[in-house]
Amino acid sequence: LGDVYKRQWFECKVKYEKTMENGLVKKVNEPYLVDALNFTEAESRIIEEITPFMTGVFEVSDIKRARYAEMFEAPGDDSADKYFRAKLIFITLDEKSGKEKKTSQNVLIQAGDLRDAVKRLDEGMKGSMMDYTIASVTETAIMDVYHYEVRNKKAGEDKPEYEA
């Protein structure tokens, strides 16, 4: 299918009224990360994913591309309840000019705190052949990450309407 159909990450902000721990209701605008082909699919997917968790009215207030080269998640680790964005600088040698070339990439890390995020990043990068330095690691406001999954279709759903 080529790059035209390459899945990518979208940060979707969802605005709704949330009941806080003290019992007060507050309007919040929370970001979620969704794996999708385009903006239209990202909106439809975030609505599908969060609807079961919403009790009142909500709206998708913003969608933007999120460029993450890699994601290091911590499935099954309940203490890893935050997402951190790390900017990595890769140093390569330009063979023609002989000069060092620096390129940067963002990665997303699920971790409990900053120290844990750096540890998980280093573990995740162990297999990398490229030299890198960590330029920054910052906590994000991302609430959750939704990967693309192929849903099982019911019998007959894949038939065109005129054949049904």
Which residues fall in each region the model found?
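Short amphipathic beta-strand and strand-loop transition segments with alternating hydrophobic
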Residues: 63-76, 137-147
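Short, solvent-exposed interaction modules
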Residues: 66-129
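A cross-kingdom feature marking solvent-exposed beta-strand/loop segments within repeated
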Residues: 18-35, 52-55, 99-107, 127-129, ...
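Short, well-structured hydrophobic secondary-structure segments
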Residues: 35-70
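Short, small-residue-biased leader/transition segments that mark boundaries at the very start
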Residues: 1-5
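The feature marks the first
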Residues: 6-44, 90
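Glycine-rich, aromatic-bearing surface loops/beta-hairpins
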Residues: 128-164
